[in-house]
A protein has these predicted regions:
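Conserved glycine-rich beta-strand-loop-beta hairpin in the small C-terminal domain of fold type I
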Residues: 263-277, 289-304, 342
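Generic structural signal for small/hydrophobic residues in well-ordered secondary structure
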Residues: 29, 46, 80, 142, ...
Length: 378
């Protein structure tokens, strides 16, 4: 049952929470995460927001933008995205302009389940660690998603350790967008670990466990960050919504949320990815398609090397066929894609639909892309 009693329903829907968020959910999260990971969290380490997009609006404006150094001096600080492409929703959250610095990825050819035709993005640490903005104190935070929207890439434990060390070296936080990651919804297939300490800000969401409409985001951070987020909640929303908290709290307390993630959500999307890969190989196996190694999330990232048109044009062509994808160039936040052809050769494809819809869309992608390559040969 969603509500244990009429009194419980009145408490959750008829009253505001405090600006930090619903106390029962915060307590349940504290107990759950300490039990799973041994982090020694307290309620002072957790704040709730009205969705993870709301959380990133707060965090990117707290750590990025214009900072006053003295009465007559200010400095612009950017959010550093250590590996682009990244989540398109980050792009416009700053109140004043865009404040991002991004690094192009290293592209490595890999196999997936014994098959060729795949690649994986790696962080280019040589380029990252030599960024002038880092050396000049013009970076306010480092942020990455894991698994990554749009590619399904999962940064390795080694990459995360180096990003953590880099953030600490420069006295800035490492923000990790965990919307698709462990422990819920756990749409992640790589053998990796999840770490936290007070220089790391972890962001979670209830959206990918099937509750996007309740708009519940979760921030795990140092107490001073939680206090700042709570103050912003008070100004912007008075308090976060409690409906998602009412649903999630008992599911965390009795372990059903983890069971749902491990036994239903994760296997479903893994099977969807396998099905989509097989269909893409069938439709475009003889053409220059490369697929980012599916390591998590609910998308596939497709690279059509030397595509005769831009991914934006491909989007328009597929839209006319009744199939929607997202052009890759929009995900390279902070990078000038005019000088980076790879960005214009990639698309993001959702795998969340039923198999019949998935096959229909992939058949359309195959038909249009084959036509483009075949026309280019003439």
């Amino acid at each position: 049952m969603l509500f244990r009693s009429a009194e419980h329903a009145v408490e959750n829907i008829g009253n505001y929470s405090n600006p930090q968020g619903d106390a029962a959910l915060i307590d349940a999260l504290t107990a759950f995460l300490n039990r799973e990971y041994g982090w020694n969290l307290t309620a002072d380490n957790i704040a709730l927001t009205n969705g993870s997009q709301n959380a990133f609006f707060y965090l990117f404006n707290l750590f990025g933008g214009k900072f006053k150094v003295s009465d007559d001096l200010s400095v612009e600080k950017a959010i550093l995205l250590p590996l682009a492409p990244e989540y398109i929703g980050y792009a416009d959250v700053h109140v004043e302009g865009q404040h991002f610095v991004s690094v192009k990825p290293k592209i490595e050819a890999v196999e997936h389940e014994g098959e060729a035709g795949f690649f994986k993005y790696r962080v280019d640490f040589d380029a990252l660690e030599s960024l002038p903005e880092l050396k000049e104190g013009k970076v306010g935070a480092i942020c990455c998603s894991r698994p990554t929207n749009p590619t399904g890439n999962v940064l390795t434990d080694g990459e995360m350790s180096r990003l953590d060390a880099l953030a600490q070296e420069h006295g800035i936080p490492l923000i990790i967008d965990n919307a698709y990651g462990m422990p819920f919804p756990n749409i992640i297939y790589s053998d990796v670990t999840l770490n936290w300490h007070e220089n790391i800000i972890l962001c979670f969401s209830l959206s990918k466990v099937g509750l996007p409409g309740v708009r519940t985001g979760i921030i795990i951070a140092a107490p001073e960050v939680v206090k700042a987020v709570s103050s912003l909640n008070a100004i912007v929303n008075l308090s976060p919504t409690r409906f998602g908290a009412a649903i999630a709290t008992p599911l965390l307390q009795d372990g059903r949320l983890k069971q749902l993630s491990d036994d239903v959500i994760r296997p479903f999307y893994r099977n969807q990815a396998q099905t989509a890969v097989s269909l893409l190989k069938r439709e475009l196996g003889a053409y220059p398609l490369k697929i980012h190694k599916p390591e998590g999330a609910i998308f596939l990232w497709l690279w059509f090397e030397n595509l005769p048109v831009s991914s934006q044009t491909l989007y328009e062509m597929l839209k006319a066929e009744g199939t929607l994808i997202i052009p890759g160039e929009h995900f390279f936040v902070g990078i000038d894609t005019q000088d980076y052809p790879h960005a214009r050769e990639c698309i993001r494809m959702s795998i969340a639909q039923d198999v019949e819809t998935l096959e229909k869309g992939i058949v359309a992608i195959g038909r249009v892309v084959r036509g483009l390559y075949d026309a280019g040969k003439q």
